[in-house]
A protein has these predicted regions:
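Cap/insert and terminal regions of metallo-dependent hydrolase folds
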Residues: 89, 153-244
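Catalytic core of the metallo-beta-lactamase
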Residues: 6-17, 112-165, 180-187
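Active-site environment of divalent metal-dependent phosphoester hydrolases
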Residues: 8-10, 28-30, 65-70, 91-94, ...
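Active-site neighborhood of phospho(di)ester-bond hydrolases with catalytic His/Asp-centered motifs
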Residues: 23-24, 57-68, 85-88, 144-150, ...
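Metallo-beta-lactamase
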Residues: 86-141, 232-247
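Zn-dependent metallo-beta-lactamase
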Residues: 1-44, 215, 239-240, 246
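Active-site HxH/HxHxD metal-binding segment of metal-dependent hydrolases
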Residues: 32, 45-111
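Pre-active-site segment of Zn-dependent metallo-hydrolases
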Residues: 19-61, 73, 151-159
């Protein structure tokens, strides 16, 4: 597998055997139209992906029904025959927005996507009813775990979930100052240690860059890069790439 942090926020590109999956793609400069009241975020580059990369995309995974994960405009600009792997909650939102791509519900049992076995695992409060974590495993046994908000430590421990690479939040964000939306770096380290992950990609960078009405109620705190880097190789920048041996 090859992993690319496809933008400076939380779009992910997973390639294997010359086919690829896009996770939570947002491929425009503005998250919502100018003047949008509730939420807004902007970025200089739409993504770092080339046309060749995009042409390899054979499937989408949408992990949450929120606008910064489920970006309708991006999906509408991609081929409408791309299958979308997601939850029942997101599937309903896709139908509501007249997205006619094939829709497949991911489960803990696992589904093969682009020769990668993909499982949807439980996440943590307050997201457990609307989002899911992803565990990917290729035919060589390489594993990647993705969680865009908060990991479910109890589940990871009980099920002995292991992963070579983790894609996690590390910059604390709290709604109203106490409802945790994104993990702080200490919890990120704990998750990596629990799963045995030696490589870490940061997702959801700089939550303080999310503006609009919701931004007034979210308090954020940056992460300690040096502390993270002691025992874990950290990838946090747009365009960062990791390839497993033999890829």
């Amino acid at each position: 597998m090859k992993i690319i942090k496809a933008d400076n926020y939380q779009t992910w590109y997973i390639e294997y055997n010359d086919q690829s999956i896009l996770i939570d793609p947002w491929l425009s400069n503005s998250l919502t139209p100018d003047g949008t009241f509730f939420i807004q975020r902007k970025k200089i580059n739409k993504s770092c992906l080339s046309k060749e990369d995009i042409d390899k995309v054979k499937a989408l995974i949408i992990t949450a029904p929120f606008e910064d994960h489920l970006h309708i405009d991006t999906i509408k600009k991609l081929p409408n025959d791309l299958p979308i792997y997601t939850s029942s909650v997101v599937s309903k939102a896709l139908i509501k927005n007249s997205i006619n791509n094939p829709r497949i519900i991911l489960t803990e049992e696992g589904t093969d996507i682009c020769s990668i076995n993909v499982k949807a695992l439980p996440t943590s409060y307050p997201y457990f009813s609307t989002t899911f974590s992803i565990l990917m495993r290729d035919s060589n046994g390489n594993r990647v775990f993705h969680e865009g908000h908060r990991v479910n430590f109890r589940y990871l421990s009980k099920e002995n979930i292991k992963s070579d690479v983790a894609i996690l939040t590390a910059e604390e964000s709290k709604l109203f100052g106490f409802v945790e939306l994104g993990m702080n770096y200490k919890k990120t380290i704990k998750a990596c240690e629990l799963m045995g992950s030696k490589k870490l990609f940061i997702t959801g960078n700089k939550p303080n860059n999310t503006k609009g009405f919701i931004g007034n109620f979210i308090k954020t705190k940056g992460f300690n890069t040096e502390r993270l880097s002691k025992n874990i190789e950290v990838f946090s920048n747009e365009g960062d790439i990791y390839k497993f041996n033999g890829e």
